[in-house]
Amino acid sequence: MSHLKLDTLHVQRSPRGSRRSSRSSGRSSACSSGSISPVPIIPIISISHDGDESESESEIETEPARLFQRRMSIKCTNNLAAIIKEGFLLKHTWSFQRWRRRYFRLKRNMLFYAKDEKCDVFDDIDLSDLCYFECGIKNVNHSFQIITPTRSLVLCAESRREMEDWLGSLKTATAPQRPRGDSFLIEQHDILSNHHHWYATSHARPTYCNVCRDALSGVTSHGLSCEVCKCKVHKRCAAKSIANCKWTTLASVGKDIIEQADGSIIMPHQWMEGNLPVSSMCAVCKKTCGSVLRLQDWRCLWCRATVHVACRPQMAVACPIGPAKLSVVPPTSVHSISTDDAWDVASPKGNFSPLLVFVNSKSGDNQGVKFLRRFKQLLNPAQVFDLISTGPSLGLRLFRHFEMFRILVCSGDGSVGWVLSEIDRFNMHKQCQVAVMPLGTGNDLARVLGWGSSCDDDTHLPQILERYESASTKMLDRWSIMVFEKAIPVPKTPKMSISTEQEAMLTGMVTSANHHLRFIVETNDTQTLISSTRNLCDTVDDLVCRISEHHKDDEQLAVKCDILRQKLNMLLDALQEEEIGAHSGDDLIATIRSLIARSIPVTPGSNAYLLNPNISIEKTEKDQINSKERRNSRSLRSSEKEALQCRANSVKRAIYNVVEHSEPGRPKRYQRKLSITPFEALKLPTNASGESTPCTSPLPIIPPINIISPTMETSRLTCISPLPDTRRDSVDENFFNSINLPAPRQFADSRRSSGVPEVIQEIEEGANGETVYRRSRMSLTGGANIDDAGNRLSPCSDGGENTPTERKLDFLRVPIHTGEPIVDPLCDYRPHEVFERNYYMTREMDKDKEKDKEKDKPVEIDIEKDTCVEKEGSMPEEKLVHTCNLQVPGVVVTPNPQNVYSSASITIIDTDAQTTTEQSSSDDLGGEASDVLSAISNEECSVASEIFDKQDAGQTVGDIIQNMDASNFTHIDSPETSDETEAMPGESIMDDISSVLGHDITYALQDNTLTDDTTTLCSEHVGPPKPPRKKSLSALSRTQAHPRRRNSSPPRIARLARMDSDDNPQQFGFENIVFEIDNRCDDQKMREPPRYCSLAQFVEGNDIARQSFKQLMLEQHRGGDNDSEYPEHQQTPTNKGANLLITTSEDELSTQTAIKIEIQDIDATVRNLNSSMKPNTILTTSTSPTKKSGHGQDISVVVRPPTPLRGDSTKPTVSLLPVSSGGAMAVSMTCSGMLGVRAMNASEIRRHSSHAPGLAVREFDKDKDRRHSGFNPNQLTLDPEHARFLSSSPAASRRISCGSLFKKKNKQIATKRSYGLFSVRFFVVAEPDFRLATLALIRPLIPLNEALPNLQTLKGSKSSLFMGSTLFGFDHLASAEKDKEEKGGKDKEKTPTEETNRKLPIINPLVRLPNWPLANGGGFISKCLLANADTLCAAVSPLMDPDETLLAGYHEKCVMNNYFGIGIDAKISLDFHNKREEHPEKCRSRARNYMWYGVLGSKQLLQKTCKNLEQRVQLECDGQRIPLPELQGIVILNIPSFMGGTNFWGSSTKKDDIFLPPSFDDRVLEVVAVFGSVQMAASRLINLQHHRIAQCQSVQINILGDEEIPIQVDGEAWLQPPGMIRILHKNRVQMLCRNRSLELSLKSWQEKQRQHSISIQRDASSTASEHANSTDEVISERECYVLLNFIEAVSSLVKWVKFLIISHPALQHDLYEVACRASEALESIHPQGKLLEGPSLRTKLVEVIDSSRQLYDDACTLLRDRGHSLILREDLETKLSAALANMEMELKKCSVQKCIDGKLRAYFNVLAPNEESDGRRKSRPFWVRLRSGSTAGQQAFKPPLTNTREAPNNWSVNEVVTWLETMQLSEYVDSFLKNDIRGKELLTLGRRDLKDLGVVKVGHVKRILQAIKDLSEN
């Protein structure tokens, strides 16, 4: 074809063509038929196509035979137009029904296809007259057919999503072009256009084409049907059909719009002709309409009404829309689409609650396709959306302008979560209510809401819609899954996986080549070198040959193979030159330098390898090459060795490039082996003596790198778990606490140790201006600590002698001059081997120079303490000789400065001491290097800038620093990243690292008791303030231009009294003992003001934003020193308390005041408070000379929290003690209880850490302290003292704040009393732990009423900072917000909510037992625990709701609606998900899915892949650490249904159950342990409760180690890398629950209305058939019919009563007389066999009714009294019972009324007398009948009621007809009358009999059979 000049070939073939041409055209075309191609039988499609269509169409003589036309075009021609869509599809070929894979390319009005995209010739199809449709109803194989006038193609896509994409593209290609071509307009055009949506189907009865009016072909009437309007057409006629599908908007109604006089629009009928349902009845004449012989009569698409052609003009104009009127959006109400892509809606008159339907077409074995079409038929098609094709966003955007609407999600739980997430995105919670239709597998949410476990039948969809209309509303809690992911290094040994043979072969070749390259570089043996070279050449040749054979057409691969061969030749040349010694390398190096110099950057940047996201920090064979290189015995010159290594490295890279190109799907596998940072290749020699020798670094100084970004990774990645996998199963859980999580610098708060693994340059400037660089190196190889010799260090080391495994101080001092930076132009391009070689050579060359420099530097070395103390200022300022300005990632022991004192237990940093030649005062303590400095490797903190302030005389710092390795997960706050932000007043550097110290301090003040609840530290005794050297932060930053070191050594701290004695009443109140640490800023830190955390701004629903407000620092002038006296006798233990301190200045604008609240538990009284603390004392001690102006006053706030013993009974005391210069005034607002107050120095600003240190008493037994330490006796412990405090992460520490310690404000306390009694006007800013930036800041110029509106924007949780506080009185904010948020009718939830707030978290007390979960709860200990559950489980102080500031670095992974699982359940879900992805055909039905879950669960029973999960995760509920037993999973439930209907929490049957009843609207989570798959299976059958863990409001899970753990949320599973997971309450959404009581009420009411309407219709019809002059005195035709039944019943009763008396002469004879009298009265109304006529008949009937009623009553009385002694014949008993039953029923129809003339007349009720309440009376239980067996004889002879079987058994034909009419099945009356169906025959009717009677509708058959069953049972 290449030599042809024509662009297009036209091949035409007539039916008379030769056989050869037929064969040739058949091979290359889709159809070889002369007419429209028939659709063959495709076995994959569920609804088969009929093969006789072509035969039936060929019989039509009017249709001429079409010519087959095939068009072909060349590649260059069809590339001219724009391509709409292209890709591969399966094309059906007509020979043997095979499928061929073809490449299709769609353009405007043209479709091209060929074998592949590289073909030069394409078949093209003109789409100008196109018809396309789906194949089949369910369309299992995703096939569709394209029909044009000349071609017909059946195509198959891989998924339904792809099929719908192709159909949408075909729609776009054939639709006229529009000015706006975005996807929304295309979807919108699809909705608003009235085009039909065809699918191929078969029909059970003759069906006719709506276009040509001919019958569809074949016996099954196979053809196309519109999925919306059910329009039927031939396949050949589909393109000719007009766009008259169901209306969607007012514009689509067109000319049929009917407008009334007042301007309102009426909804008209939309008629579709022919193909009416079976037994359709005309709405006008009530006769059957429709035909199976032709296309006739009409049906409405909205109200389902059917009419004759002649009756259609008489039909009402307005359409009632139908039974689903409440849910339908009438097209007349949707006027247009506004600019915001939402409908402009005019609500119709009457009730209107539109329903938005989302259907997942893949759910339930493709049942969703049927539901999707059925909903479009019942509702407006624009209300129904397919989640697979359009998603939920389109429907929500269109419904945005509806005030209230309902959403129905027809799918599984995953799709429900998708829709709810979109509702969050559009913020539409208040205007929509969500319902669920269960089409998925588990359907847990649908079960809980009452909608059942499955819904597979779409026939009863109208009735189901009625249920949703009567549903009630409940709130569903939704929970955010916030995830902080830890970057994990690539493991050294790859995990085993199932790989293909080709991959294994390639991997083996690559490994072999690396092995030989290693020997070539390292070996000294000539024979080994030769053999390795030969084997390398053979391996490379084999690799190139094999890859080239499989990729012959790949030009790029061929180029790469040639490059590989060239690299190999260059390596051989280098080896040859090495042997002959002729290679010098000068020309090669010069060439490389010249090439690199062209693109070298001006300033040295970070190494390119650091920017690789796939950097592996594991050592490979290269490390072994480099480690042995310096010991290589081959005497090579450096240039020769460099050339050889470069050649080997080039060969290795070329091999990797070839393999990566041959396997495009797996590029990362080989990149990881290749991407080795220069730091991995370095191993620094260590000094055996422990001496640290500073040296210059040949490595470049790397700028800080943000490791949070997924594209960044540094060499300082730390591994989460320091243990190997083989030891993880038996190690104490506290061992895993040594975790440093990375955080972005812009998000890391200085108050929390974020453990940022950054190479941070910290500058410490001495007095001489010398600059010292400090760096930290942490665990380069997978988290291990490496010393200089490359040895793996232990995670924690004991004090004592120094061993090679002992951890050194992680700082390397490199005294490098910072004058002119030395730039290595090759640093970014040099290979690793060259890099390492230069480094080692430089190090050896500079060793002598460094020793010479050390001789000049005065250093004092203490071998015993392993410390090296530098003398400050002694380093001469001289330039160092630099070879390369590179960084040394080494771990060496730095010389400790003089102000650092180390011992076996503590490390003290004296920040006030000058670094002079004095020795440490703690020489007597044996030492180890402190690790606190490595943990404080923060940009804002240098080693010497961490200062512990103290009093000069009495106040000191104790043992507070130890075991910094065991840092827990820490929270990350958002600081102000701007450099202009100054330090806030009162801030100190110590506060910035308080969380680091707080969680790593083991024993502050050795003999004193501290717990998790301690928030601040204060000393027992404070000496009087002297004229101190201390100044505030602001003063220091301004006044000290040249700061100097202070030389005061730390004295010993005064200890508190021991509180562990038995007679101490406060021994159980130790949680609130307070110690104090005064913090001062470092002098040198003032030169670079630190940046503190300010108010964080957040992006809604996601992470923290890069915004925050800025707090300008106000100047504060200090007039002088304060030498006021300090009375010693007032400092008693009862005076310790909390102070709220205010400092003021002369200028109001510069006045600043800090509020400080400290809490402690002191047994004091109000009298002690009033007697021991005087107001003038406060005045004397806290007034400074700056208060001369009198502005402001000191306010002391004293707060006492509840203790575990007193709990809620102890109420706090709030004392506001304002102080002025003129006098003192104390206003005390006391709720109850008492406190002491200790005055503080006004010049000091004391603050506490936001995270409390988790400390414990050394003497305290760890068994007793198990609750606070998480001690587990089943696990190994590393260090008894070390493990005691490793119990809680920062989230687990309980924070005591003013918000948690104040009770709810009483209503009697006025708001004015809360904050309006003083002249000070507050501006309150909350501290960063809660909502705002600092604890409190008071400015007199900003009134409180101006500040309070700002707090209203803090729409957080209920327990915010000041909510419930009587100090600030912000209760009205919370209450107003709550009232605004909660709606009416929520009073029932009020009490439970308050109760949960008071008691949560509720922790199962059995978890404290060592043998849990084996404790059955029945023993004495368990009963005692349950009895004291409130005391054991109550929190000392309620945990603050996690604020958004602590979520910095987190991102919302997903939202939980149902449940969260980690471990075995998530593993099963993940395996099932993978199975479904691999084999979707095996997971299409619900039964198969349950089977797969069982198989995968049984697999876990054997494999136990999640064993020892408790050692890999840590669980915290509301901040409390939960000790975990041996388990395999943890499940957190929001709803009481788990994985397919299991009540995993268990039902609560005990009255004394401590847990709250589970609910999905109580904002409470249930935490459950999973011990194995057997428990999961047994929980479906047994009510298990021993596995309960807790009920709480927030959960945090810490994932340890370096392995991913399976996690699932609502059935969607994934592998979660190590890090932290926090589950927090997000919002609530309105869900629709089934209301069965309302359904029953509506059903009964509708039944009564239906009966009433039937009676009216009967009266109207009977009146129309009667004479015009008829009156009430004349018996109507209907009444005459009832009268005949009455006469029959009376005659039968008289007959059988007489026969009874004759058979038993002993009975009363008066009954016989009554029977005779009734017989005579009966004869009087029909003398001589004729009924009386006229008004006399009603009068005579009164006597008959009275006599027959008397006869009935007497007979019943007789049988009741004498029945036990009578012995009747069986036939007589049966007939008498039937006669009495019929008589009772007929008497109910009769009524006697007194007329105006005074006469009594009888009337008959034409309705059936049976009441549903009587007819559905339930039988008594079996035991009741058995118990009343003595009266069985009486019961047997009682006259049966009308609800017995005998009553319907004796029905006549007329009664059966009446029964049919009451069921609205009057269309079958004629058939029943014609076949004389009586009651006896009615009770025996079956499905086949009903079909013979003409009842063919499935629904009618079911209704009749169910009604017959009810008659038989009743």
Curated annotation (Swiss-Prot):
Biased composition (Basic and acidic residues): 1-10
A GO CC term assigned to this protein in UniProt: cytoplasm
Chain's role: Phosphorylates diacylglycerol (DAG) to generate phosphatidic acid (PA).
Keyword tRNA-binding: no
Family in the record: Belongs to the eukaryotic diacylglycerol kinase family.
SAM domain span: 1851-1914
Subcellular location: Cytoplasm
Organism (species): Drosophila sechellia (Fruit fly)
Keywords tagged on the record: ATP-binding, Cytoplasm, Kinase, Metal-binding, Nucleotide-binding, Phosphoprotein, Repeat, Transferase, Zinc, Zinc-finger
Region of interest (Disordered), ranges: 1-37, 621-642, 783-805, 1016-1053, 1116-1135, 1175-1216
InterPro entries per the UniProt record, alphabetical: ATP-NAD_kinase_N, C1-like_sf, DGK, DGKD_4H, Diacylglycerol_kin_accessory, Diacylglycerol_kinase_cat_dom, NAD/diacylglycerol_kinase_sf, PE/DAG-bd
Main EC class the enzyme belongs to: transferase
Protein name: Diacylglycerol kinase eta
